[in-house]
């Protein structure tokens, strides 16, 4: 056993069972500068998503060979998998300028009209969280996507007139974490939809190794795999955990990350071997120890761990369900055999997954 495995480190102070923000797949302000340096610049550099990369290579290559703008592209999938990066790569592969905005920023049709009227021929317009666009802006987008023109209403009341405005041919790339919330008319106007999938440990290990090389971090292969295995299948989380482990290694190990250093660092930052944090484990313990494994309603669970129901439902549950530790049933949440064993208890007969 190494010195790092024998040493006990004090866990960072937390309030209640609050989530470790390093495990939040959503982008945070602290990601921006580092993410920019780590983003791949081409489809060849992009790690993972082999099916999407192959499909996009054909879609973009076909458009280039014909000398036309490619079909509009919808990138769907959970946060943190590289949808924004893929939009940047699409523009790069086409040799086009990229204009970026988000659904929530397009509150009025006029907001979208101003952006569309400033596009140059061949530009790529990226709309993140496109499912959150206001309806007036979305309806204007229909005509822009199909006919490359928009109708602008001038005036009010009976005297209002509609003025058609031609816009330059462009390619729209939309990103959504909730494809089911897209309206049918909007979804149907995308010529190609790419479904981004969670990463396996092998691809995430490559992500960590590549990021370490760019950041100048001295890391062993098994340490990269250790970080990858706790990253919830999400590159954004893997890159964050690498930075936390690097901080630990700089202070405690002369900057060299071995697997022992990685494990010790992740213990300090409260990320266990399954990628669970304090809040995830609190939910499991509330299910198992407080309610015999369930079923339990989300409001009761939230009360037990001192969090809002939306936090339990939107932050904890997706990964716990995907990890096979929680099952959602019509009667409530149920702990599986894997959840019982994760906290060191033997599941009773009849437990899901036994």
From Swiss-Prot:
Record protein name field: Holliday junction branch migration complex subunit RuvB
Molecular function per GO: ATP binding; ATP hydrolysis activity; four-way junction DNA binding; four-way junction helicase activity
NCBIfam families: PRK00080.1, ruvB
UniProt similarity note: Belongs to the RuvB family.
Region (Large ATPase domain (RuvB-L)): 2-199
EC number: 3.6.4.-
Head domain (RuvB-H) as annotated region, ranges: 273-354
Biased composition (Polar residues): 17-30
Pfam families assigned: AAA_lid_4 (PF17864), RuvB_C (PF05491), RuvB_N (PF05496)
Location(s), subcellular: Cytoplasm
Amino-acid positions noted as binding Mg(2+) in the UniProt annotation, renumbered to this chain: 84
UniProt keywords, alphabetically: ATP-binding, Cytoplasm, DNA damage, DNA recombination, DNA repair, DNA-binding, Hydrolase, Nucleotide-binding
Job of this protein: The RuvA-RuvB-RuvC complex processes Holliday junction (HJ) DNA during genetic recombination and DNA repair, while the RuvA-RuvB complex plays an important role in the rescue of blocked DNA replication forks via replication fork reversal (RFR). RuvA specifically binds to HJ cruciform DNA, conferring on it an open structure. The RuvB hexamer acts as an ATP-dependent pump, pulling dsDNA into and through the RuvAB complex. RuvB forms 2 homohexamers on either side of HJ DNA bound by 1 or 2 RuvA tetramers; 4 subunits per hexamer contact DNA at a time.
Region described as Disordered: 1-38
Organism: Corynebacterium jeikeium (strain K411)
Principal location listed in the UniProt entry: cytoplasm
Region described as Small ATPAse domain (RuvB-S): 200-270
Superkingdom per UniProt: Bacteria
Domain note: Has 3 domains, the large (RuvB-L) and small ATPase (RuvB-S) domains and the C-terminal head (RuvB-H) domain. The head domain binds DNA, while the ATPase domains jointly bind ATP, ADP or are empty depending on the state of the subunit in the translocation cycle. During a single DNA translocation step the structure of each domain remains the same, but their relative positions change.
GO cellular component: cytoplasm; Holliday junction resolvase complex
């Amino acid at each position: 056993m190494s010195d790092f495995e024998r040493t006990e480190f004090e866990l960072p102070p937390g309030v209640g069972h609050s989530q470790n923000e390093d495990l939040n797949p959503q982008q945070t302000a602290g990601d921006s500068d580092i993410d920019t340096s780590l983003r791949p610049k081409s489809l060849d550099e992009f790690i993972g998503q082999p099916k999407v990369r192959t499909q996009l290579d054909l879609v973009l290559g076909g458009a280039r060979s014909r000398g036309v703008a490619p079909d509009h592209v919808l990138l769907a999938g959970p946060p943190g998998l590289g949808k924004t990066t893929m939009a940047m790569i699409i523009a790069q592969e086409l040799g086009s300028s990229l204009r970026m905005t988000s659904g929530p920023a397009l509150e009025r049709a006029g907001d979208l009209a101003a952006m569309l009227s400033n596009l140059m021929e061949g530009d790529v317009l990226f709309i993140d969280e496109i499912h959150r666009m206001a309806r007036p802006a979305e309806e204007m987008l229909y005509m822009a996507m199909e006919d490359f023109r928009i109708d602008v209403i001038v005036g009010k009341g009976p005297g209002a007139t509609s003025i058609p405005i031609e816009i330059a041919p462009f390619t729209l790339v939309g990103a959504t974490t909730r494809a089911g919330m897209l309206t049918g008319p909007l979804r149907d106007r995308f010529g190609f939809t790419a479904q981004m999938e969670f990463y396996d440990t092998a691809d995430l290990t490559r992500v960590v190794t590549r990021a370490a090389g760019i950041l100048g971090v001295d890391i062993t292969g098994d340490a990269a795999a250790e970080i990858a295995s706790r990253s919830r299948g999400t590159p954004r989380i893997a890159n964050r955990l690498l930075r936390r482990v690097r901080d630990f290694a700089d202070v405690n190990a002369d900057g060299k990350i071995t697997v022992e250093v990685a494990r010790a660092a992740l213990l300090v930052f409260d990320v266990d071997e399954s990628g669970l944090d304090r809040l995830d484990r609190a939910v499991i313990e509330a299910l198992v120890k407080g309610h015999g494994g369930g079923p339990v309603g989300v409001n009761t669970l939230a009360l037990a761990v001192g969090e809002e129901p939306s936090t339990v439902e939107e932050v904890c549950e997706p990964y716990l369900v995907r990890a096979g530790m929680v099952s959602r049933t019509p009667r409530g949440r149920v702990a599986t055999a894997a959840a019982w064993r994760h906290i060191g208890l033997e599941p009773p007969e009849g437990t899901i997954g036994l």
